[in-house]
Amino acid sequence: MGKNKTAYVCQECGYKSVKWLGKCPSCGEWNTLVEEFEPQSFSLVKKEPSLVLPVTDWEKEEHERETTGFESLDNALGGGLVKGQVILIAGEPGIGKSTLLLQISDRVANGKKVLYVSGEESGTQIALRAKRLGINNENLLVYPEVNLEKILQTLEKEKPSLLVLDSVQTIFSERLESSAGSVSQVREVTYRITEFCKEKNVPAFIVGQITKEGSIAGPKVLEHIVDTVLQFEGERFNFYRIVKVIKNRFGSTGEIAVFKMTDKGLEEVPEPSAFFISEKANAPGSVVFPHTEGSKPVLLEVQALVIPALYTTPQRRTQGFDPNRLALILAVLEKEAKIFTRDQDVFVNVAGGMSVKEPAADLAVAMAVVSSKKEKEVPKDFVIFGEVGLSGEIRAVHFGDLRLKEAKRFGFKKALIPKSLEIEIDGMEIYPVSHIQEAIEVLF
């Protein structure tokens, strides 16, 4: 092993410096650079040289998929777990990450061996939770340990079919002198666990904590090393949890799986669209929008509230929608449709805790604002989507036919869409519009 060297590493972003700095030049945070001792190289040397084969021969060794025991999660991952796949799952403390992984471990352990490595809880604590969840499986091995070298030795000995590491911030390597959870330790642990999983074809779930800003704690390289990144979201005092696929080398991103927290653990919600629009109120400011980020559209409720401004400067607040995009939409409404909100507070919310980034939501947000402003309901059997341009034009968006088919499946009979899409769906009335003023005239 090479001689250790000293570096000052930012604990927020992983930036390295040869000397201490008060402010990190990369992320701008203060007093985050900590002195760490690390080996000269983190390069991973293969025990055997890799094969050089034609791409067609590699395809013959195509990835076999293993189920997680949850159909909706399998679908979100692209069909299940791939051998050697390393999945990082991140979320707030207490949100239910360990509960979900314990349930997955139990379902995979039917006929296979699963190793659950816990750096946060004792074996007794995990056993108590397992009992509460009704888990009693001899193939589920629990190993409370924080030493990486001991964990790797146990993996070589037990040869599990699935590894769960809870969590990466609690594990340390003897190769480094820094404490567990430091940037260097997190990087080293992830590298070596990933190396083992790829070599032995063992899929793994690695739990990662998040920062107060909501991003994954640790260096960004952590997200690059793993194959898949899952974000586990939801309010701690709410029953529902959402797993979002942020990155996936073996499937599409943007997929979601919805779960309901019960006293017996997490239960999957097979129809996310039904969940997100189940409590929709027929009131001004409420619009249904068919959202698509992955392969399957999901119906979401977009809500807007327009009220007289309480202060000299009107407020613009959003939850789940880009505030800059809202500012653009309000400006277009004022110039092109004479809908003035300059002396009013405007609030926009995407119900259910979802975040929408695609411009296809523009028209839905605009119509929700107009609905609240005019205090007139949007007809309840309408779905709305389309991008709003600066001249008020309604621009085409992708997956228009899939969005409409999902809406029809849930009983929606009318749709306000961009005129340029030229889509017809049997059993649905399509209202194509080319300008935002046309859209307002159709609905109100």
UniProtKB/Swiss-Prot annotation:
Q: Which Pfam families match?
A: AAA_25, ChlI, Zn_ribbon_LapB
SUPFAM superfamilies reported in the protein's UniProt record: P-loop containing nucleoside triphosphate hydrolases, Ribosomal protein S5 domain 2-like
Sequence motif RadA KNRFG motif, location on chain: 247-251
Question: A single Gene Ontology molecular function, please?
Answer: damaged DNA binding
Enzyme kind, highest EC tier: hydrolase
Give the domain of life. Answer: Bacteria
Region annotated Lon-protease-like sits at 345-444
Q: Tell me the GO BP annotations in alphabetical order.
A: recombinational repair
- What UniProt keywords are attached to this protein's entry? ATP-binding, DNA damage, DNA repair, DNA-binding, Hydrolase, Metal-binding, Nucleotide-binding, Stress response, Zinc, Zinc-finger
Q: Where are the zinc fingers (C4-type)?
A: 10-27
Family in the record: Belongs to the RecA family. RadA subfamily.
Protein known as: DNA repair protein RadA
Tell me the residue numbers annotated for binding ATP.
91-98
Look up keyword Repeat and say if it applies: no
Q: Which PROSITE patterns match?
A: RECA_2
What does the function comment of this entry state?
DNA-dependent ATPase involved in processing of recombination intermediates, plays a role in repairing DNA breaks. Stimulates the branch migration of RecA-mediated strand transfer reactions, allowing the 3' invading strand to extend heteroduplex DNA faster. Binds ssDNA in the presence of ADP but not other nucleotides, has ATPase activity that is stimulated by ssDNA and various branched DNA structures, but inhibited by SSB. Does not have RecA's homology-searching function.
Classification from the root reads: Bacteria, Pseudomonadati, Aquificota, Aquificia, Aquificales
Q: What is its EC number?
A: 3.6.4.-
Q: What note about domains is in the entry?
A: Has a putative N-terminal zinc-finger, a middle region with homology to RecA with ATPase motifs including the RadA KNRFG motif, while the C-terminus is homologous to Lon protease.
Q: Which CDD domains match?
A: RadA_SMS_N
